[in-house]
Structure formats: structure tokens, C-alpha cells
Amino acid sequence: MLTMGEGNVMTSNNRFASPPQQPSSSSPGTIQNPNFNFIPFNSYSSIIPKEEHGMMSMMMMMGDGTVEEMMENGSAGGSFGSGSEQAEDPKFGNESDVNELHDDEQPPPAKKKRYHRHTNRQIQEMEALFKENPHPDDKQRKRLSAELGLKPRQVKFWFQNRRTQMKAQQDRNENVMLRAENDNLKSENCHLQAELRCLSCPSCGGPTVLGDIPFNEIHIENCRLREELDRLCCIASRYTGRPMQSMPPSQPLINPSPMLPHHQPSLELDMSVYAGNFPEQSCTDMMMLPPQDTACFFPDQTANNNNNNNMLLADEEKVIAMEFAVSCVQELTKMCDTEEPLWIKKKSDKIGGEILCLNEEEYMRLFPWPMENQNNKGDFLREASKANAVVIMNSITLVDAFLNADKWSEMFCSIVARAKTVQIISSGVSGASGSLLLMFAELQVLSPLVPTREAYFLRYVEQNAETGNWAIVDFPIDSFHDQMQPMNTITHEYKRKPSGCIIQDMPNGYSQVKWVEHVEVDEKHVHETFAEYVKSGMAFGANRWLDVLQRQCERIASLMARNITDLGVISSAEARRNIMRLSQRLVKTFCVNISTAYGQSWTALSETTKDTVRITTRKMCEPGQPTGVVLCAVSTTWLPFSHHQVFDLIRDQHHQSLLEVLFNGNSPHEVAHIANGSHPGNCISLLRINVASNSWHNVELMLQESCIDNSGSLIVYSTVDVDSIQQAMNGEDSSNIPILPLGFSIVPVNPPEGISVNSHSPPSCLLTVGIQVLASNVPTAKPNLSTVTTINNHLCATVNQITSALSNTITPVIASSADVSNQEVS
């Protein structure tokens, strides 16, 4: 026991009892500190609630004057919900009394404070208002105080106390849940550790190695084992008389097709006469393309094993990815439905009208990304666009196409060079809704002058339960794997911000599609011919995606049609579909062959920057393509004509004989026609070339597909023999039919610098011509220089013939721009 004062003993009975009231502070009944002569304790209620203990201690430290003010305002005493106030004490009722109290060294003990609670009606009224608005303004507080007979400060502090009480309750509930979750995680961790100790090796049955093994030790051990295996294979081959294959490199996470060819040795093509000292790589380092009739594959990944190890998402990252996916769907929906101020219209001197642009400041305010500041370093440019259209396909079929990488790349073959589903993170709870995929894609422009865009991204699909609309959103993965880079070494960087589409079903199998395309890209090596085309968003913008989607949906609808009455030489609907599939492979092969997809490198034939001719070589030895060495040449020319005019002239049979590289001056005759869209230019034709060498057993045929939309047009050809066409129409496998496509790509562009634009002037276009020839039937052959000269002459002649025909039949947009149109290679 502790003895204090004059023998007063502190016990459990009198520890919290109020001291007796004495007339003088020097009375022996007053408890004083024997060493410091502190002010005596004041009397308090015998029971102080736990919630009020901290506030009463604070009141003691602030002094009586502050205590009196707080008591008067109802901010102290009682519970937070009661709103009780202290009755005014005459001893401490004014400022003079407070001053006298400070002057007196030992003031008499204060009288016991009296408290009273608010009435039930007052509490009910304030509770009702609190449920509606926990933060009332001054007018509401004054009105409520007048109705309840309270002071405004009392109402103010009651609401403060009530909010504090609610916050404390929420914190306590959250702490309880966190503790429970922590206990569950600890239990699960213990369970997993126990299972880990019991694991055994599936090969030898021995126990697993506990602890982490350094990566460099594993790498050294693997190298040693491979050297030992190679040595044993060499010894075994001496005794067996046949070569023994050692163990192949470890398979990557994404297994390429067995048909995928590896990089072939150099063709050793001497290009020193044409190639000068410029940064383009030599054509002696060209790679062979994979067969295009199968799904899109990755190139050889032996140099990217470290990348593959970091590719997949761990379990804890999957949870974060799902949270990001839900927020990205909300962002996409808001970007589709919101106009100004998120999207603003700006005048464009290039097109002579207005364009829709994203307000970056408003976007950053509405959708702050945690990694935004780090990713915006360097020369990143933001490309954002949105559009909407109606397509002839229901939402279920569209969603299925977007979730299947092969179908997606097939539908957008002019944009998507290849695509792959890397990992299925979530397959959805009910149907496709809730599916989350990790994907890789390479996007292309149909020209070797524009580098492709490669990116890993997450694709999430969600259906709105109320409206039934589908949301398909792509968002970047760099928040999970900052070190993940595209597999090919490229000179630019590309990242997909939340982009995608909202699909709404309409009657008769149609769908309303709203599309938003939002990316950040660092383009450094786009040729000046395509610089404005790419920068304006016409190459990868939302309008281009929707234009291609509309056209492809019409093509698929035509492919599935069964009520075709006039089939011509095509005997059945099944034969019609087989010809359409063969033609689709023709277009897809052409698109990939004339771009920089799959890491193709191209060589320029001149040192001038305005030269747009590029050549490349490939060794072909796979089914579906002719065997041997293929030489490909591509050239791009600006023309002062609309892409519709150029498209119509090339398709016109009266002018097709001018294309010597295609028909050798002979006029073609259409023997079969398949319409695959509402536009008459969207069709497949089987052409018979009228030459003297034709006979009943030797007929030259050419398969042609043409397609056009607002984003551009394509015309692709390939010679085929009669037996191959008959094989396709009979329903046999057409993937082995060798095709070597050549053709034209036409895209609308804005006029170049220095040319005025008015509202009556149609847009100009870029004409890209791609020609492929089989230089040799032997894959190991080395094409000579004359082959390169020949294909270059054919290319220049084709461009000149088209330009001359356009100038003679169509009035150009700008008469004084003839000099600009002469930029084709001479």
C-alpha cells in the first residue's frame, strides 16, 4: 500500500472515491502531493465511461475556462450520441471569475458539474438528419437548432461527436475482419508449408530441396549437363553410324507450332551495288515467315527464355489484375459515354474540318493511374480516338472472336499480324463474362516503312447484368511486370492504355459497337511518307478498327449464307465457302509479307530519304507456299486521288491489261464471282487469263480478292492452277495449295506539307505495291543481282502505269501537285 499525506492510505475502496468537500484547501482531508504541491484533484463522477476518459483528461489539461466553453457547447461530457451539455456554474460563469481563479494559488474545489441529456425528440431529429446528411451546412444546423431549442454550436458538436463515433465503430469492425483474415492467412501459410515439407520429386521419388537455390548455380549446372549430353551423343553416333540428336532447348511457356521454321542461314546476296551507308540492315539477314494458313505463332524464343520466365502472373498478381480489370471497364464505359469536356473538338488544317481529341488534363483528373508519372518519361505520345458503328453480327459471336486469339487475328488480319493467348487468368463464372486473359499481339501497317507495334496486355470481358451490354477492355500489364519487353528487339515502345469496345445487341442480329482506342507509343523510325498517316490516328485509330470490323462481319455473314441462288461455275455452297477460305489465306499472307511483322528486315535500294522501295528475301519450304527462294519488293507512292478512285481503276477489267506484271499485257476474263459485302468492290473473283498457250488441259487462272472500306482498300492476286481450284471446290484441304500473293494496298491520307486543302477537295492516298517472285526453286540457291533488277523494274513499271492511267482518266485533286506525285522510284 502507498501512504500519502497525513496517513491516508490508498486502497481499492477509496482509490476512485471523490475527496470530501472541505472549506479550505489546507484542510487535512485534501489529498496533496507530498513533494510538488500540485493543485488538488477535482471531484468527478465515480464511473467514467471508456469513451470519455481521453476527452476528460484533455479537459483537465486545457484549464477551466476552456472546460467551461466546451461544456456549454455540449462537446464534452456524456456519450457521443447523447449530446449532453453542462449546466452553467455561477462560480465560473464569466471571465472575471476565471481571472480570480488564476490569481488564487489554491482555489476552492469546484462544485460538482451537472449534466443533462438531450431529449429523445432532439436525438431522433438529429439522427434523422444525420442519416440523410452527416455533414450539414450552417443553414441546416441553424434551422435544426431553432426547431429543437438548442444552440447552433450544440448541434455542430453533436454531429462531430456522432461522426467520430461512427468512424470508431467502423474501425473496430474493420480491425475484427482484418484479424480474422490474418488468422486465415496464417493458417493457410502453415498448411502450405506443411505440404511443402512432404513433397517428393516426381522423377526419383526423393525429397525436395528446401530453401532457394541461386539462379546462377542452376544455370551453371544446366550448362554442364548439356555439355555432358552432347559428348555422350557424339560417342553414341560413332557406334550407331547415324547422328544422335541431343536434348533440344527447354520449351518456352508458349509452345510454337512444329511447323514453325527457324531462322535460316544467310542467303549471301550481294547488295553492295544498291545498298549504301544507311541504317537499314542488309538483306542477307532475312528471316523466313511461318505458314500463314495456321494460327499466329511466335518466332524462335531461345534467346528470350528469361522473358518467358517472367511472363505469367502469379496467384497474388491475379487478384490485383482482376481489381484493375473492373476499374478499367468503368473507365472504358465512361470514355465511351462521355463527350465534353473529356473529348473536345479541334480544328484540323490538314483535313479542313474538326477532329475529336482527348482532353489529357481532364483524363488525368478523372482516371489517375498509379504508374502514370513513371511511364510518361521519354518521347511517349498519346493516341486516343473513339467511334461507334453498327455491325451485322450478334454480341455473343463478337465476344467469342475477341476471346480467341486466332479468330481475332483472322478478323483483323490487315491490322493484327499475329496474336497469342499467353495465360488464361480467369475463364469466367457464367459463360464468357468475367474472363481475363494475358495476351500478346503485333499490330502492323501494310508497308515496310512503318515498324510494327508489339505489346503484352490483359483482356477482360464483362457483361452488364442490368443492360446486357458486353464490355471488352484491354489494359497494360507493366504494373505487374515492369521488366517485360517484346520478344523482338525493336526501336520503339508501345503500351495499350484501357482500350476496347462496348457491344449492345440490336434486333435482327445486329450490334451497336462503341470503340475507344487509347495507347502510348514512342515512334522514332516511321518513314516520312507514313509519318502523318500514323500520327493522325488513321493507321491504328478507333475508326480503322471499326471499319475493318464492319467489313469483316459482312464477309463472315456472306461466308455463312446458304440461300445463294446463282453460284456460276462454283457448284455448291460448300465449294463457295472453301474458295472464300482460300482467298482469306491469300489476303492474310499478303498482309504479313509486305509488313515488318515477324521481325522481317528490309533493304533500301537508294540512299535518298524519299526512296520508298524496299526488298527482302525468304527461303520457303513449307506447305501452302512455293518451295524455293522468294524475292519480295514493296514501294509506296503518294497520289493526288482518292483511294476510291484508285481502287476502282485497278479493279476495272479494261485497265487490268495495263498491269504487265500481273497479266503480261493480256486481258483477264472473270469466270466466277463471290460477293462478300454490301459494297460491290468487296468480292472474290476467279480470273481466266487469255493467252495463246491456253488449252483444255492448261489454263492459267488467277484468284483475286478486293475489299474496301473508309479506312482503305486491298486488291490481292495469286496465280493458281485448275487442279488446285478443283481440289478446293471439292471440299479437300486447301491449306497445301501453294500461293504467292501480290497486290495493292491503298490508304487515304492528308495532303503533304505545302498543299492547301479546301472543303471541295477530295483526300489523297498512298498506294503501296507489293510484288513477290520465286527467284529459284532450290531453297539453298543464291539469287543473283539480275533478279533484283528485274523485280525493281517491274515494280516501277507498275507504279508508272497506274499513275499514267489515273492522270488520263481522272482529274487530280490539285493540278500543281504533279511534282509531288513523281516521288515514285525511277
Swiss-Prot record:
Residues spanning the membrane: none
START domain mapped to chain residues: 314-558
Keywords: Coiled coil, DNA-binding, Homeobox, Nucleus, Transcription, Transcription regulation
Subcellular location, principal: nucleus
DNA-binding region: 111-170
Phenotype upon loss of function: The double mutant pdf2-1 hdg5-1 exhibits abnormal flowers with sepaloid petals and carpelloid stamens in association with a reduced expression of APETALA 3 (AP3) in the epidermis and internal cell layers of developing flowers.
GO MF annotation list: DNA binding; DNA-binding transcription factor activity; DNA-binding transcription factor activity, RNA polymerase II-specific; lipid binding
Composition-biased stretches (Basic and acidic residues): 88-105
Compartments where located: Nucleus
Family classification: Belongs to the HD-ZIP homeobox family. Class IV subfamily.
Protein name: Homeobox-leucine zipper protein HDG5
Lineage: Eukaryota, Viridiplantae, Streptophyta, Embryophyta, Tracheophyta
